[in-house]
Amino acid sequence: ALESSKIGKQLRVSEEQLTQYLNRSSSGNFGSGQDIPYTSVNFEPESSLLKRDYLLHSSGIILGGQTSAALELLLGKMSAHPDGLPVLQSHMNDYNGLYSLYFEKAHIAATSLDVDDIRHLVPGIPLILLSLYKYSVGFYVQAGNPEKISSVEDLTDPKVVFMNREKGSARRVYLDRLLKERGISSEKISGYRNEAVSDMSSASAVFEHRANVAFGEEMIARYFPGLDFVPVTDMQMYLAIPAKSVKNPGFSALVEIVQSEDFKTEIHHLTGYDTSYTGEMICI
């Protein structure tokens, strides 16, 4: 059996536990409903890599995507809901989350990509996009913005060192598209090939003076008193769910939570995110 730690109804498996399990695992059936025993272990709960062999033995909901305060709130409410299911969140970027959804390695993908991008990455599968929140994205800069960075054109200044996001993240997709629209070559941006795998690590790079500027969501800048934030655009966070799953137990509980006024109020107070469209569903 795969050893795990249970936090409410959230199932957390460390990468070390998963590796040990995969070394001795035999094949099974995805979605077979076989329960995983919850046992007490000495490992600290960690996000695990999403593995096919693990999914074959999973009985809960696999959510692919990067974490956020709003998602943590949602998962906490799923734990308390009478119809909620155990949730394992696998931390990955937008592209990989949707890739996992397409190949049935995940049940839900959290993504901030545009609707057209989502449709193209998950072709032939009817999806429901459940809107979570809208949030501001822009540049992390040193306090006082000494390099006077206000637009993507300013990234070409030879004195400016940029910390990029990894390919497949919504931030990278947006930035690359913007560079193409403005006719700006990435070769003119010092540090373009330097990649961070989260907004937190991007902001840390600027805070620690390893870069002059990075691109990420506004809320993360609040954790770094030595940083300022320059807004560039707004992004919408969606939960992409196969349409056939929405009315199933567990999934319907998730939709109910997101559409509740309590959830909208708590998200707004906790994060300042725009909840004007929270709970709305788009069929694609």
Model-derived features: where do they sit?
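Periplasmic-binding protein-like
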Residues: S131-G138, F224-E256, T275-C283
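N-terminal hydrophobic or amphipathic helices and topogenic motifs
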Residues: A1-N96, Y102-A106, V122-P126, V152, ...
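Flexible hinge/capping segments at coil-to-helix
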Residues: L132, V141-F162
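Ligand-binding cleft/hinge of the Venus flytrap
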Residues: L73-D83, E153, R165-N194
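Short helix-loop capping/hinge motifs at secondary-structure junctions, enriched
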Residues: A143-S151, I184, K244-G250
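A ligand-binding cleft/hinge motif common to bilobed small-molecule-binding domains
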Residues: A110-V122, A203-T233
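Short loop->beta-strand "edge-of-pocket" segments that line small-molecule binding or catalytic clefts
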Residues: L56-T67, E153-V173
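Short helices/loops that flank or line small-molecule/ion binding pockets
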Residues: Y95-A109, E195-A211
